[in-house]
C-alpha cells in the first residue's frame, strides 16, 4: 500500500515536471497595461521592458531586484536607456533579493502608483513561480499579462526551478491566484523582439 502511494506520488511529480518543462510560456502580444514590471536575473528581461515602454504599451517600467549599489545613471549607461525615458518612466526597485520579495516590492509600487494592470517580464522558465508569488501579493482585481523572455534552459535549470515552484506553492498554502486576473493574449503574432540585456 505504501509502495503504491509512493509510486503514485512519483508519477504525479514526473508528469508535473514534464508539463512544466514542455509548456514554458511565450512572449506576450501587443497589449496595453498601466505598467511593465521586470524582475532582474536573466538576459533580455530589461531590454524587453524598455521596448514595451518605448512602444507605448505601458506608461512606466519598474525594475525589481536591482543591486542597491547601482545608481540610476549607472543603470542607464549599462542598458543604454535614453535620458528622457529614464527620467519619466523608469523606477529602480532595490529592496528585493528573491522572487518572493520581488512580489512584495512590486506590490507596494503598484499600490503607490494606483496601477491596476501590469505586464510581468521574466524568463520563460521563471514565469510560473513569479506569477505564483505575484498572485499571493498583488491586490485583488489586479490584471497581469505574462510576457516571457524566451530562453534555452538546460535540464538542471528546469529541475531546480520546478522544485522551487512546488516549494513556493506549498509555503503559500497551495496555488493561489484567484484574486488577480490573467490578461488573455489576443494577438500572438505581434510580439516584441527578444532583444539583448540582462540582470542588473
Q: Model-flagged regions — what are they?
A:
Residues 21-159:
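A structural signal for short, hydrophobic/glycine-enriched beta-strand patches
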Residues 66, 81-87, 164-171, 189-194:
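A general structural signal for short secondary-structure boundary/capping elements
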Residues 7, 37, 48, 164-167:
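Hydrophobic side chains within alpha-helical segments
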Amino acid at each position: 500500500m505504501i509502495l503504491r502511494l509512493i509510486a503514485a506520488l512519483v508519477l504525479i511529480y514526473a508528469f508535473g515536471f514534464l508539463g512544466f518543462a514542455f509548456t514554458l510560456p511565450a512572449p506576450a502580444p501587443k497589449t496595453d497595461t498601466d505598467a511593465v514590471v521586470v524582475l532582474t536575473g536573466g538576459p533580455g528581461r530589461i531590454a524587453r521592458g524598455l521596448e514595451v515602454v518605448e512602444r507605448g504599451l505601458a506608461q512606466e517600467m519598474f525594475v525589481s531586484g536591482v543591486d542597491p549599489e547601482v545608481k540610476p545613471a549607472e543603470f542607464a549607461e549599462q542598458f543604454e536607456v535614453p535620458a528622457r525615458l529614464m527620467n519619466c518612466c523608469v523606477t529602480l526597485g532595490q529592496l528585493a533579493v528573491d522572487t518572493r520579495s520581488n512580489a512584495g516590492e512590486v506590490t507596494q509600487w503598484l499600490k503607490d502608483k494606483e496601477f491596476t494592470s501590469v505586464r510581468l517580464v521574466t524568463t520563460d522558465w521563471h514565469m510560473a513561480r513569479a506569477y505564483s508569488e505575484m498572485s499571493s501579493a498583488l491586490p485583488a482585481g489586479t490584471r497581469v499579462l505574462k510576457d516571457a523572455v524566451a530562453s534555452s534552459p538546460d535540464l538542471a535549470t528546469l529541475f531546480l526551478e520546478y522544485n522551487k515552484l512546488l516549494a513556493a506553492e506549498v509555503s503559500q498554502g497551495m496555488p493561489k491566484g484567484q484574486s488577480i486576473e490573467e490578461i488573455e493574449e489576443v494577438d500572438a503574432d505581434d510580439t516584441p523582439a527578444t532583444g539583448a540585456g540582462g540582470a542588473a
